[in-house]
């Protein structure tokens, strides 16, 4: 989704549980991320300020659009813990802000499967989890990471529904097979 001119928000999440309750929580997580990132505005509603739960490295511009957007992860965590903590619902989440001009991707991986950067030779990089899941720990610190995605590269994010799927013979698909699929495709 578009955040500001030249910045795109990229998000994928997987809520714990199954069924209607889990689906409703996923809708809540989605709405909170979009509202707190500034993608959606609510007339007359004051949003909370910075939580200081997204660490900003001193050498970076902490007032940049990406940092404000990434703060949405911490604000979502705070909201879920305070208002729904007794339900023990949480989500793994990958949220990134892509500067479409430079290819810079600033992201938080909150316990989600590693996103993959795929180039002409196959898998170039795994974007490993850097932070805890969202909605479980009241004082969680979310650590942003930064990479540059080269022109022509593919960013692939997925849920464990891909790697946990089974063949008709009950064979697990797994992470290794997923990596092999992309290495074979690009060679």
PLM features: what roles do these ranges have?
Residues 1-16, 20-187:
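Conserved subregion of the PPM/PP2C metallophosphatase catalytic domain
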């Amino acid at each position: 989704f578009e955040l500001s001119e030249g910045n795109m928000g990229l998000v994928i999440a997987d809520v714990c549980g199954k069924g209607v309750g889990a689906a409703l929580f996923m809708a809540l997580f989605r709405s909170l991320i979009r509202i707190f990132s500034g993608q959606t505005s609510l007339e007359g509603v004051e949003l909370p300020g910075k939580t200081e739960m997204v660490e900003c490295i001193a050498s970076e511009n902490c007032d940049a659009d990406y940092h404000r957007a990434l703060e949405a992860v911490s604000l979502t965590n705070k909201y879920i813990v305070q208002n729904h903590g007794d339900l023990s619902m949480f989500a793994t989440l990958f949220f990134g802000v892509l500067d479409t001009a430079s290819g810079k991707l600033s992201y938080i991986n909150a316990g989600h499967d590693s996103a993959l950067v795929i180039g002409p030779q196959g898998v170039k990089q795994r974007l490993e989890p850097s932070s805890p899941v969202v909605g479980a720990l009241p004082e969680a610190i979310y650590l942003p990471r930064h990479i540059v995605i080269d022109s022509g590269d593919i960013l692939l994010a997925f849920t464990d529904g891909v790697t946990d799927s089974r063949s008709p013979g009950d064979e697990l698909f797994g992470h290794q097979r997923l990596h092999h699929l992309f290495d074979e495709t690009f060679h």
